[in-house]
Amino acid sequence: MKVIYISNMAPASDNIGGTSALPYHLMVHRSDDVEVEVFTFNTNGLSAEKIAAVEKELRLKINVLPMNRLAAWLLGLKGVMSLLVRMLLPYPPHYYLRLDRATVAHIKAMRPDGVWIYGEELTGISRQLSEIPQVHTGPDCEVLYYERLLLQPWVGRIKRLRCRVMMRKFRRLAANAPTCARYHVVGAADRDMQLKINPEIDVNFLRHPHYNYNAERKIKFAEPRIRLVLAGRNDHYMHADAVALIDELAANVDLAEHYEFTFLGKGWEPMHERLRCAGWQSCLITFAEDYAEELCRHDVQLTPISVGTGTKGKVLDAITNGLLVIGTAYAMENIAVHHGEECLQYERACEVPALLRDIANDRRRHEAIAEAGRAAVLREHNRTRASQALFGMFAAKGL
């Protein structure tokens, strides 16, 4: 099978300048009979050296495309002008990316068995190649994201206005999505929202593949203190629930006898100081050269995600590397784990201190939960299995 992959971002083993890791891990363990050639606008700015390394890792060729003038102008805008123009456009900026005539002709001349398009906004490119069988990966539904964000009480008036404007753009995009493609998302609610907006399209939810992990790591909580980690950037995806969580930990400083805490990511300085001043042993790491290696130095990951869609890659990272994950519903959605069996889930931050006391009092039981979580994710989110499901969509009836 010969498949042409088209994306705004170049694929990479980690998320670089966007969600570049998902397509990488869907390709890295593909079947030997699936040949892929990549065409990308490289909006995430991978260097020539990095692109060459990815080509070798994925056993394929990457073609970097020039942007059409309109898209280059839109994506090059900065500051107030960028905000103003984006607000006035009927569609999100990446929608205006197009293949030039020579590239369209070249792809058609290759006579591929299918075209795989990555990025919800690239429906215009889908129309350029409408006669070729297509699979279009979201990977999430932006309308669902903005709808969930607007439910949050901490969203201010200006941000709320911007969210409503962007939600209308993405709703228009989804409503006009071409029926020449089959659509692929990594969230069940994302699929349902896409179908609610446009019942005419074929949308499929497939499990998100896990990323790289340390298969040799043994699950045994550290002595004398269990090592907690909160990983990721302190942004609107986590900030509100993270503040509530840190307040609870600061108020239950007796837990510091059993735990030490690490913030792994940017923007956590105020919360790091809050815990330290409360009496916790807290460490702040803003950058790790090898993220998986640093993650493996810990035992339990706290994931207080306030809002989001799809599948959270950092949660999969933690579980496959043998950490016990304690997270909100948004952190755990679309992952094949269940509370009390392969993970721990909470609704309100005030529940977390009791969970941590249970872990400290019964380490072995919770190590077993972490082990069960790793086994479930390695089985249900297996990269070979995910790749087979994705490329198998080209063989489905109607393509």
Task: List each language-model region with its residue ranges.
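Acceptor-binding helix/loop patch of EC 2.4 sugar-transfer enzymes
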Residues: A72-Y91, H136-R171
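Membrane-proximal helix-turn-helix segments that form the acceptor-binding/catalytic region
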Residues: R101-K108, E142, I158-Y183
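A short, active-site helix/loop in glycosyltransferases that binds the activated sugar's phosphate group
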Residues: G124-S126, R168-I201, W268-E273, L390
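Conserved catalytic-core segment of nucleotide-activated headgroup transferases in glycan assembly
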Residues: H208-R276, L284-C296
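Acidic donor-binding loop of glycosyltransferase active sites
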Residues: L295-G310, N321-L323
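Short hydrophobic beta-strand element within catalytic cores of glycosyltransferases
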Residues: K314-D317, L324-T328
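Conserved acidic donor-binding segment of nucleotide-sugar-dependent glycosyltransferases
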Residues: C343-C350, D358-R364
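A charged, aromatic-enriched C-terminal amphipathic alpha-helix characteristic of glycosyltransferases
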Residues: R364-A395
